[in-house]
Every structure is written in structure tokens, then in C-alpha cells.
């Protein structure tokens, strides 16, 4: 089984091909058609424009084998807006990204951290569809041992910030 972990940072997964800045997801991916079983990209797609993200999803579709899985984790503007609570807002303010208000937390996800695109469930699903994935094979997912972002910002904060979705070729 061939698995790619793209934009891995320090989240190195055993048994995976782990790539960070060495592989530019805004360019054609250097893999043959139908050659990959699983692609995981955690908190990387928001660092591209939406058109570049759709191109990346299209490239992922090309290189995935039939029934291959693309798993994406991105910050969710909706979740931050809806779920931001006292502990999250306190952490956010103490992290230097705002003043502890919900408004600054939402602004930060949109404007800081090198983010070039904003995401929620509907946008992610529409972009998967535009890239060729069947809407019946797109599903939201819970957290698993793959995600490493919670190790950086804490599991509670990660649950508030992150949406995870899979698409099956």
C-alpha cells in the first residue's frame, strides 16, 4: 500500500511517504496515474489559493488508485465561529494571534498564519466535486491517529478549529 503524507511538518508517519516543503502541491504531482492508495494533507491546503487547491485535488484524483482515499484536514471558519469557547479564546489570545475575542479568532483564521483560502464543509465538498470526486463518496470524518495538529495546539483547540473530510476515487 502506497500512502502520501503531504505538508507533514513534524508529523512524520511510519510507513508513509512524508513530504513537507520539498513537494509543492500547487504543481503537478510527480506520481503516475492510479499509483497511490491514500493521500493525507493536514493543515496545508489553506496555504494555497482555492484554485490551486482544486488543482491539487484534481491531481490527487489522477494519482489515486480506484477506491483510493484523499483525506484533508483544514481550519473551519464555521466551526471557529460556532464553537469558539472561553478556553479556546483565552488560548488564542495568549498565543499572540488576537485579543481573546471571537472576532479576532475568526479574523486570524482568515488573515494570519499564511492562509490564502478559507474553508468550511460546503466549500471543501464543492472543491472535491469540481476535482472529479463523486459526491456520494465524500464524507466528513472524526479524528484519528493520523492527525498531528492537536499535538501543536491541543486537542480541544484542534477540535474547534479543524474540519476533516475524505473523498474516495
Where are the regions that the model predicts?
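S-adenosyl-L-methionine-dependent methyltransferase catalytic module, highlighting the catalytic core
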Residues: 52-61, 65, 69-168
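Conserved SAM-binding loop
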Residues: 2-81, 165-169
Amino acid at each position: 500500500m502506497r500512502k502520501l503524507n503531504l505538508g507533514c511538518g513534524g508529523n512524520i508517519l511510519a510507513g508513509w511517504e512524508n513530504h513537507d516543503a520539498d513537494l509543492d502541491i500547487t504543481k503537478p504531482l510527480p506520481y503516475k496515474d492510479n499509483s497511490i492508495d491514500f493521500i493525507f494533507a493536514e493543515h496545508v491546503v489553506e496555504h494555497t489559493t482555492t484554485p490551486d487547491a482544486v488543482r491539487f485535488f484534481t491531481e490527487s484524483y489522477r494519482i489515486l488508485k480506484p477506491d483510493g482515499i484523499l483525506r484533508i484536514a483544514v481550519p473551519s471558519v464555521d466551526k471557529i465561529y460556532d464553537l469558539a469557547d472561553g478556553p479556546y479564546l483565552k488560548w488564542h489570545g495568549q498565543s499572540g494571534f488576537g485579543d481573546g475575542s471571537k472576532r479576532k479568532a475568526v479574523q486570524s483564521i482568515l488573515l494570519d498564519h499564511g492562509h490564502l483560502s478559507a474553508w468550511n464543509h460546503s466549500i471543501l465538498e464543492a472543491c472535491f466535486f469540481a476535482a472529479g470526486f463523486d459526491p456520494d463518496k465524500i464524507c466528513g470524518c472524526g479524528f484519528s491517529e493520523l492527525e498531528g495538529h492537536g499535538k501543536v495546539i491541543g486537542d480541544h483547540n484542534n477540535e474547534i478549529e479543524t474540519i476533516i473530510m475524505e473523498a474516495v476515487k
